[in-house]
Curated annotation (Swiss-Prot):
GO terms for cellular component: endospore-forming forespore. The lineage of its organism: Bacteria, Bacillati, Bacillota, Bacilli, Bacillales. It comes from Bacillus anthracis. Induction: Expressed only in the forespore compartment of sporulating cells. Keywords: Sporulation. Its main location: other. One of its GO terms (biological process) is asexual sporulation. This is Small, acid-soluble spore protein H 1. It is found in: Spore core. It comes from the Bacteria. Belongs to the SspH family. InterPro entries: SASP_SspH (IPR012610).
Length: 59
């Protein structure tokens, strides 16, 4: 995935399924300059991680 698509997903009112290493995640935010997104596991929303947007996949 790229930064442009992550930003589109963040601004969308629709639910868009995204995974990180095969795990369903919600995207919390995205830093356009670094290409890093803050995501959290849908099943464990208490823990977020920062990942490169290239590691995210839209399902």
């Amino acid at each position: 995935m790229d930064v442009k698509r992550v930003k589109q997903i963040l601004s969308s009112s629709s639910r868009i399924d995204v995974t990180y290493e095969g795990v369903p995640v919600w995207i919390e935010s995205c830093d356009e300059q670094s290409g890093v997104a803050q995501v959290y596991d849908v099943s464990n929303p208490g823990e977020s991680v920062h990942v490169h947007v290239n590691a995210l996949e839209e399902k």
